[in-house]
């Protein structure tokens, strides 16, 4: 009986839980106080991140990814800087006049195929006026080309209706040669450039002038595809209509495109051996591999709700070089990983149901950023039976893997 007089024992855990409900950070008293402050228009102060915390984050980024990592992934894409080349008929008239008045046959080296009756008639007129026999022949050739129906030519319409995205273009590169072939086949091409230098813009203008056939168009846009933000921005820009509204007038600057071809050629200078693995290899793989995967998934998703049968054909630029040269950074690992991309497409239908692949193993290409340093050895290796390619030659092979028939 005496023991019973001592009263019940209180469970300390239950007491702590009760106290938390009343006086804890999310308890009744705190919630009531926040409600009253909000009703009075008073915002409770938020603790600012301390300088020490910011310093720790910066130090961690520098240690793991390198001091220049923020610059490496800084977005460059800007839809306002996109340049469209689609006025071949206008530059064709300039070429005709330049050839005639300067007596310059080379001004007619560009493409005039399918430009229509106006250009054909103008070329014929110059042919009748010219006293230069060779120039007269050239004008007549232009008149015949302009009068052709590009859609009736297998060569000049092989990519008609295709929307091709080509990343990493630079003059004299494989990507540039691929763009040339796509334009010659009548495609609409979206080409990305990291540098967006005047020399790249001049190349784009000239390559359109020399190669565009039929209704071919060329967009040149700046993009840093080491930046996932830029990858996403590029995908969104490609897949959405771009408009400009002035008062009551709305102008379509770019229609929404549904890409059918993707050539991921964006790549950094690759260097470094296994001992350099870390931030250097990670930055290279980010651009050549992970950004490519993200772009494939994003581009393939465009139009999925409205065109369920559409396919994105991806030409992955593979390589037999899986580390056999050495000193080329993450290049070998990335090219090995391309095998995995193709393999996982068979298992991951959530994205691959709208994607097809060509995965050629590109061999020795002369004059490129990767192999150009070995050009003095070309004569010797070819003498021993090893075939090398120019950028234009390998582009032909890649484009042959990109037609509807392939």
Language-model-detected regions and their locations in the chain:
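Flexible cofactor-recognition loop at the NAD(P)H-binding site
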Residues: 42, 171-172, 195, 261-272, ...
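C-terminal helical subdomain
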Residues: 1-9, 14-24, 28-49, 53-106, ...
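Canonical Rossmann dinucleotide-binding motif of NAD(H)/NADP(H)-dependent dehydrogenases/reductases
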Residues: 150-192, 196
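Catalytic loop of short-chain dehydrogenase/reductase
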Residues: 155, 266-381
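Glycine-rich phosphate-binding loop and adjoining beta1-alpha1-beta2 segment
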Residues: 195-213
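Rossmann-fold scaffold of SDR-type NAD(P)-dependent oxidoreductases
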Residues: 167, 222, 246-269, 316
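Short, hydrophobic alpha-helical segments
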Residues: 239-242, 303, 398-405
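Rossmann-fold cofactor-recognition segment
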Residues: 208-229, 233-236
């Amino acid at each position: 009986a005496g023991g019973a007089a001592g009263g019940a024992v209180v469970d300390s855990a239950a007491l702590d839980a009760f106290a938390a409900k009343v006086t804890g950070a999310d308890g009744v008293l705190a919630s009531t106080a926040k409600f009253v402050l909000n009703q009075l228009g008073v915002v409770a102060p938020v603790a600012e991140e301390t300088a020490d915390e910011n310093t720790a984050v910066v130090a961690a980024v520098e240690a793991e990814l390198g001091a220049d990592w923020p610059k490496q992934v800084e977005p460059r894409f800007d839809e306002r800087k996109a340049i469209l080349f689609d006025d071949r008929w206008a530059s064709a008239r300039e070429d005709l006049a330049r050839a005639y008045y300067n007596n310059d046959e080379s001004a007619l080296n560009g493409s005039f195929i399918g430009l229509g009756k106006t250009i054909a008639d103008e070329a014929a007129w110059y042919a009748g006026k010219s006293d230069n026999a060779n120039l007269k022949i050239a004008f007549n050739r232009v008149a015949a080309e302009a009068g052709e129906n590009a859609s009736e030519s297998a060569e000049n319409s092989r990519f008609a209706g295709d929307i091709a995205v080509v990343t990493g273009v630079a003059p004299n590169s494989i990507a540039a040669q691929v763009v040339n072939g796509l334009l010659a086949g009548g495609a609409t091409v979206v080409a990305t450039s990291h540098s967006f230098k005047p020399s790249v813009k001049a190349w784009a203008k000239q390559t359109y002038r020399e190669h565009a056939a039929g209704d071919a168009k060329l967009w040149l846009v700046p993009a840093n595809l080491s930046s996932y933000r830029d990858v996403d921005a590029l995908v969104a820009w490609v897949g959405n209509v771009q408009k400009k509204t002035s008062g009551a007038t709305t102008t379509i600057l770019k229609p929404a495109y549904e890409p059918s071809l993707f050539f991921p050629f964006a790549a950094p200078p690759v260097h470094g051996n296994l001992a350099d693995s870390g931030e250097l290899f990670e930055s290279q793989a980010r651009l050549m591999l992970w950004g490519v995967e993200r772009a494939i998934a994003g581009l393939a998703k465009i139009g999925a709700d409205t065109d369920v049968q559409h396919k994105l054909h991806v030409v992955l630029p593979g390589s037999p070089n899986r580390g056999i040269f050495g000193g080329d950074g993450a290049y070998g690992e990335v090219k090995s990983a391309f095998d995995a991309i193709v393999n996982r497409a068979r298992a991951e239908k959530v994205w691959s149901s709208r994607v097809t692949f060509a995965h050629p193993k590109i061999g020795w290409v002369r004059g490129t950023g990767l192999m150009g340093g070995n050009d003095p050895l070309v004569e010797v290796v070819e003498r021993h039976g090893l075939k090398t390619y120019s950028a234009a030659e390998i582009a032909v092979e890649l484009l042959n893997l990109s037609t509807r028939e392939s």
